[in-house]
Amino acid sequence: MPSAGERPAVKMGPAPAGEQHRRATEDPEVMELAFEGMDKEKAPSRKRARTEPPAEGLLQPVNLSREELYKEPTNEELNRLRETEILFHSTLLRLQVEELLKEVRLSEKKKERIDNFLKEVTKRIQKVPPVPEAELTDQSWLPAGVRVPLHQVPYAVKGSFRFRPPSQITVVGSYLLDTCMRPDINVDVAVTMPREILQDKDGLNQRYFRKRALYLAHLAYHLAQDPLFSSVRFSYMSGCHLKPSLLLRPHGKDERLVTVRLLPCPPLDFFRPCRLLPTKNNVRSAWYRGQSCPDYEPPTPHYNTWILQDVALETHMHLLASVLGSAQGLKDGVALLKVWLRQRELDKGLGGFNGFIISMLVAFLVSKRKIHTTMSGYQVLRSVLQFLATTDLTINGISFSLSSDPSLPTLAEFHQLFAVVFVDPSGRLNLCADVTASTYNQVQYEAELSMALLDSKADDGFQLLLMTPKPMIQAFDHVVHLHPLSRLQASCHQLKLWPELQDNGGDYVSAALGPLTNILVQGLGCRLHLLAHSRPPVPEWSINQDPPKHKDAGTLTLGFLFRPEGLTSVIDLGPEADKPEAADFRQFWGTRSELRRFQDGAIREAVVWEAESLFEKRLIPHQVVTHLLALHADIPDTCIQYVGGFLDALIQNPKEISSTGEEALALAVRCYDDLSRLLWGLEGLPLTVSAVQGAHPVLRYTEVFPPAPVRPAYSFYNRLQELASLLPRPDKPCPAYVEPMTVVCHLEGSGQWPQDAEAVQRVRAAFQLRLAEVLTQEHRLQCCATATHTDVLKDGFVFRIRVAYQREPQILKEVRSPEGMVSLRDTPASLRLERDTKLLPLLTSALHGLQQQYPAYSGVARLAKRWVRAQLLGEGFTDESLDLLAASLFLHPEPFTPPSVPQVGFLRFLYLVSTFDWKNNPLIVNLNGELTAEEQVGIRSSFLAARTQLPVMVIITPQDRRSSVWTQDGPSAQILQQLVSLAAEALPILEKQLMDPRGPGDIRTVFRPPFDMYDVLIHLTPRHIPRHRQAVDPPVASFCRGLLAEPGPSSLMPVLGYDPPQLYLAQLREAFEDLALFFYDQHGGEVIGVLWKPSSFQPQPFKASSIKGRMVVSQGGELVMLPNIEAILEDFAVLGEGLVQAVEARSERWTV
């Protein structure tokens, strides 16, 4: 043992490959994933790739001679192909893995710079002067510029302390194992405190931890004076408040290169192992509580584990070095697993399933021969995920130890003391001591999802598995923030958690976490699939500040993943009244429990929740959580921020805030079903009805604001008796907007149908007229017939029935040559008819079925459309294209599961829109699972071959495998890029709002359009905006729209499709389409945005036929035309007289 003047042994820098004598920390540095930085750096490049040619330096096709092209492969190439076939399931996967590992690994140059910095750190530590011996409670020797990085409660403790230079300084952890990851490189340095400053009973009553903290404080003060370091700060080691570490960062250009963490530890054999068994007590009740425990001293398993973790540094490093030393595949596997954990936020803070645990798990599986050292990183990843998916360490723990020593605890004893059990080779230390059951259940669940994804061998499996982040707000249906954390002190008192507080050193958050989650899991019952929690890492702090208190650790956030089939249940059934379990049920639920008699005659305890609409039923967990936390944990609802339905307000009718419209949609669908039965049973038609199909967003539950039964107030209309219809009065506000719901009615085939397209149209027109007569005669329905459709008023809803003949699209395709030969060729008319009468009804039927399977689909699709239209981009996207985007989130949710609530689905919609590579990939929406994997591969190949002929956004369905019919007419490349940019901006803003424990603030922020980008703003008067109440910011008061609460004396056909702003827009586009683009939110927008087309300001040659909107000027002796802006702006106002309130020319944005 060296004396104060002797030079300590030092081990620095990376050890040679294969060296077995390395030391490791029990918990190597928690690495920040490279992709957090990469996302910011690469996002722009990803967008540039859509519009710009390949950047210089990217690989390009090479022209090879025929001899070079067909020459035999070399031995090296053959070996690589054979290895790829054995170790990876595809060449693409191997390339992706290799590229990812390149991104996260340290370069040799950076390693050399880090090694040099570590050598300098060692020299500085060796020069820190000693301190004379003093009592632990006498800390007057500490300089004024440093504070002890530990809460010393209780302050009085026996023992003495003196500082001596460390007996050994060792670089440990993932840096030496070559498994650390960029961009935030942390290097752990174990600083072994000399034996002479420790005493035999230092394991008792936090004495060891007090000495450890004082040792760090003295180091911190002296190292902070050194110009080598740009910053010297304290931090908690893996979130454990009893184990601070000292962070050192180099000065100058390498400031962001590395962070060195100094970790004091005791000599290897200083503590007697038998005293640190998890069943032992090392925190006396008399010392901690001020009173002795009359019966027995409770065990302190976590406290003992934290000491053992420091003791076992060397042992664990030896183990990992011997296993991973020269096995590159194992190192690659550990790196991939760390990426996997980080993307799922599983490795954060105290209790995280961190990189050290996963490294030890790899070593365990190697020892059990479930992993071989010759495996590739991908195979290691698969093997570990398979093990995690199929092994529940909360029930069946695992152990390195093969010892039969009776003095060692059994796995059963470990399970009594810890939620998750993974025992190290000593047989005494549980590596997962801090991991909660909830965290491990989440790890296991994610492993199951990942294995299913890998087994599917999807082309984008690697991207979804390792490159797609899964933040809690997107991964879980509901999120709960508990704030302030100080309230959990009352919870500990209510739940009588004194032993847990004693074990956790006063950390009331850790003490209460397990009991709280158990209560909520029991209360949510069959509704709950998974509960997770997130504790943000405690930030580092200055050495001259006191350490953060537990209440300053941020917020405790809980995430709930629900089972869709149980989420909306309004009753929790308990046992029968005469059963012994009934008393436990009443105690658990308190006053909410009541006796009820059920239809089968049974009298049972039950809890009934107040909820009628689907919106209210989705929020029943909110009632459960607030009730149980108040009852059992003394946490009032003022300390609970429940995030589950904030976005639902955007699709609520302002007059019906207790519903998000699913009931209104269901009412309209039932009315459609009734009408369908009437059509099927009609007897007065010459041909029978062969099929009735819906073809409207209402009938697939995706209409943003569902229609209500229309009961017109006739005082708002002039009546046209001869047509039995109404006409809006000009002196009244614009009446309510009524949109008819399209229904396609197929008639049976017959030889009487003509074979000429024009004749077919005439026959169809006759059927439309006859249909109106028969419906009026047989069912007394109000009908209005035209040549193309029949409008039918039923129960306040208007349906637009289109008669269809199955062969008409084919007849329209027939082209007759001069020689009389008939060939089939797609024409615009045939394609339009096929889309409207065949593809659209099939899509509506499929999406209707999707809604029955996933009740949240309606809310997700409607929120998505509400947001797109609120950005004034609704005209660029068809209803069907946005419905399919929403459907893809349910049919292809990987790496998630289908959302159970609209809020989560909308966040994922924004992520999909902003990250999908629209230029190089089609979005395949496999409705009803009709497309096989081979067919999807073929679709992607066909897409690449025909990319230049396809629209900028391509959405493929089983019925539309090539042409992307729903995006043929838009969006344009510019509109799509604008949507992508807006989604990329909105997502982080919205996520930050929803994860704010103080509440989301103004949730409508991301729905408000960016008006600053427009050249002209046309302001409309609300009097003539029929959907004014649907605005993102609904008005406090609006105009009466001529609707009665109850049906009037008679029922006339209301005015259909009357929306003055939309009619005005159509006029503007017709008149000025060559000069400007017009943007508007059809849901109550008060402003039309105008963008001048760049080409419109270019001088045009004079043409008398193109003089509209332009003025003639002379340039260079020639007459040219330029836009007459003043006249155009005046025309805007004239065309919209009575509707336009003002025209705001934002001339600072443009000049002629």
From Swiss-Prot:
Tissue pattern of expression reads: Ubiquitously expressed.
Phosphoserine: modified positions? 65, 292, 817
Could you cite one Gene Ontology molecular function of this protein? RNA binding
Alphabetically list the UniProt keywords.
Chromosome, Coiled coil, Nucleus, Phosphoprotein, RNA-binding
Biological process (GO) annotations?
Answer: ribosomal small subunit biogenesis
- Residue ranges of region Disordered? 1-30, 36-55
- Where found in the cell? Nucleus, Nucleolus; Chromosome
> What is one GO cellular-component annotation here?
nucleoplasm
| Principal location class | nucleus
Do you know which Pfam families this protein is assigned to? Nrap, Nrap_D2, Nrap_D3, Nrap_D4, Nrap_D5, Nrap_D6
Output the InterPro entries linked to this UniProt entry.
NOL6/Upt22, Nrap_D1, Nrap_D2, Nrap_D3, Nrap_D4, Nrap_D5, Nrap_D6
Q: Which domain of life is it from?
A: Eukaryota
Subunit structure comment from the entry: Part of the small subunit (SSU) processome, composed of more than 70 proteins and the RNA chaperone small nucleolar RNA (snoRNA) U3. Interacts with RRP7A; required for NOL6 localization to nucleolus.
Output the PANTHER family linked to this UniProt entry.
NUCLEOLAR PROTEIN 6, NUCLEOLAR RNA-ASSOCIATED PROTEIN
Functional summary from the UniProt entry: Part of the small subunit (SSU) processome, first precursor of the small eukaryotic ribosomal subunit. During the assembly of the SSU processome in the nucleolus, many ribosome biogenesis factors, an RNA chaperone and ribosomal proteins associate with the nascent pre-rRNA and work in concert to generate RNA folding, modifications, rearrangements and cleavage as well as targeted degradation of pre-ribosomal RNA by the RNA exosome.
**Under what name is this protein listed?**
Nucleolar protein 6
**What is the native source organism of this protein?**
Mus musculus
